C-alpha cells in the first residue's frame, strides 16, 4: 500500500521510519518532509497547509492511506477533505482537532 505522510517534524520522521519497516508498505511519500524523512521515503514539495494540492497528489498517486501528523493541518480539515475525496485518512477530523489546536 502506498502512503502519504503529511508533516515535517520529528513526529513524522519517527512515523516514516516505522512505516518503512513494514513489508506491506509500497511507496512512502512525505509532504513536505525533512532531511530525516528523505531517508525513509520520497519528500514531496507540497506545504502541509495546502489541502487542495495534498488531495490532488493523493488522488494522482492513488495512495491507500494518508496520515496527518501536525495539529494545524488536522484543525484546518485535511482529514475531512481526504475523506470527502474517498481517500482513507488517519487522524482526527477538523472539529476534534480543534481541541488540540486551540
Language model: regions and residue ranges:
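ATP-binding N-terminal substructure of ATP-dependent carboxylate-amine bond-forming enzymes
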Residues: 1-95, 99-100
Amino acid at each position: 500500500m502506498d502512503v502519504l505522510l503529511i508533516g515535517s517534524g520529528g513526529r513524522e520522521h519517527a512515523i516514516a521510519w516505522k512505516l518503512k519497516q513494514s513489508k506491506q508498505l509500497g511507496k512512502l511519500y512525505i509532504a513536505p518532509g525533512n532531511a530525516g524523512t528523505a531517508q525513509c521515503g520520497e519528500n514531496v514539495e507540497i506545504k502541509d497547509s495546502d489541502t487542495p494540492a495534498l488531495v490532488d497528489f493523493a488522488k494522482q498517486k492513488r495512495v491507500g492511506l494518508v496520515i496527518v501528523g501536525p495539529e494545524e493541518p488536522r484543525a484546518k480539515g485535511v482529514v475531512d477533505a481526504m475523506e470527502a475525496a474517498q481517500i482513507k485518512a488517519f487522524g482526527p477530523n477538523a472539529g476534534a482537532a480543534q481541541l488540540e489546536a486551540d
